[in-house]
A protein has these predicted regions:
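Short, basic, helix/turn surface patches
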Residues: 41-51, 142-151
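NAD(P)-binding Rossmann-fold cofactor-contacting core
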Residues: 12-40
Length: 151
């Protein structure tokens, strides 16, 4: 939900969130959608994960897709949140917070469809920067870590 919240604060006009209605995440997403509508000018719309018509419609009008689930991460690298790769279009940037594997099925299929893609490695790096500082009180040598980690 942090990604949605920050996107709304940064000026996103509309955010489609797909979740399972039986998950505890659903209630948090519904509460955030309500809160965001009062705090920002962003319209946050909550959809059931299995609503393929809503997914198709949302992707057609979107320029950014972010997978903020663990779907596609080791050990289940065959999983994807977009089972129909014809839904990708070159104007859609696709980001996946998954960092292992570096290119998930979602990112591979999006790239093959001409979409710009980003994996979760930079998010992981910057979470590490913050954790390093909390635990040690020191600044992590980001350039050294980036050089070794991003080879």
């Amino acid at each position: 939900m942090a990604i949605c919240g920050q996107s709304a604060l940064e000026g996103a006009k509309k955010i489609h969130v797909f979740a399972r209605p039986t998950s505890r995440y659903w209630e948090r997403a519904a509460a955030m959608a309500e809160k965001m509508s009062h705090m920002t000018e962003c319209q946050m719309i909550l959809h059931e994960m299995d609503d393929h018509t809503a997914l198709k419609d949302a992707l057609e009008e979107s320029n950014l897709l972010i997978n903020a689930t663990s779907v596609g991460m080791v050990p289940d690298v065959t999983g994807t949140v977009i089972p129909d790769k014809t839904l990708f279009h070159p104007e859609l940037t696709v980001a996946d917070v998954v960092y292992e594997p570096r290119e998930t099925r979602l990112l591979r299929e999006a790239r093959e469809a001409g979409c710009p893609t980003f994996n979760g490695m930079y998010m992981l790096l910057h979470q590490g920067v913050k954790a390093f500082h909390i635990w040690t009180g020191l600044d992590m040598p980001v350039e050294i870590v980036r050089e070794k980690y991003f080879k």
